[in-house]
Structure formats: C-alpha cells, structure tokens
UniProtKB/Swiss-Prot annotation:
Residues 116-131 have a biased composition (Basic and acidic residues). It comes from the Bacteria. GO terms for cellular component: cytoplasm; ribonucleoprotein complex; ribosome. The lineage of its organism: Bacteria, Pseudomonadati, Pseudomonadota, Alphaproteobacteria, Hyphomicrobiales. This protein binds to 23S rRNA in the presence of protein L20. Part of the 50S ribosomal subunit. Contacts protein L20. This is Large ribosomal subunit protein bL21. SUPFAM superfamilies: L21p-like (SSF141091). It holds the Pfam family Ribosomal_L21p. Keywords: Ribonucleoprotein, Ribosomal protein, RNA-binding, rRNA-binding. Belongs to the bacterial ribosomal protein bL21 family.
Amino acid sequence: MFAVIKTGGRQYRVVPDDVLEIGKIAGEVGTIVQLGEVLVLGGDTPVLGAPTVAGASIAAEVLQHKRGPKVIAFKKRRRKHSKRKRGYRDEITVLRVTEILADGKSPTIGPRPKKEKAVEPVEGASDDKPRRAAKKTAAKTAEDAD
C-alpha cells in the first residue's frame, strides 16, 4: 500500500518504512507525528481524494531535525561594480513512515526503542599508569631580557 501526501507545499509518494526529508515540522525526536493531507491511497483499490481522502493520515516517527545544504543567491549588476551574495539553509525534519492509516484510525505502532550502546572497559587501559612530570622551564633572568 502506498500514499501520496502533501506537506510544506510539496507532494511525496510514501510506503511504510520510507525515510524522507521534509520541511521542518513540530515534534520532538523519537515521537510519532500524524500527517493528515493524504491525496491518494493506493493499493488493490486506489482511492483518490477530492482534494484529500477523508479520514486518512500517515503516522511517521521523527528521526532528527537538521539543516539542509547552503543555497547561494548571487546577484551581479554588470559594469556597475555592484554585487550581492546571500545564502541560506533550510530547516529539515527527517521522518520514517511507520504506517498508513485509513478510516480515521489511530497509530498502533509506537516509536522504536533506541539501541543502548554498551561501553566495555578496555583491558590494559587503566588509570594506574605513571604520568610524566610536566617539563619545567628556566626562569628568565635580567641577562636573557637583553
């Protein structure tokens, strides 16, 4: 099953477990958000919206918020010794589509648990090693200043 959704003025074709980058939306990392503007539900019997499919939504997990690549806007007026350089970076939210919901259902899949990184102590890397003493510098005398 697939769906075509609209968010941030753009349209995306999504299937469950898709990872997509969209314009920034509200939501903490790791939470489930619902996107409600579903234009098409596809599958065995496709459903076209007019303009949206009633009761359909997409459940997606927020993976991260980041900034997109820098876009440079450069304007030059020839023979006028005039130019302007500006740049900006879009705010982006990375989502993983968890499920496609029809008929006003609520999400059944929660956020995925984060994997704990096991930190194992390395043998032989203890803090019992003798430390080297700091190197002492000679004090300046009046003869050195001349």
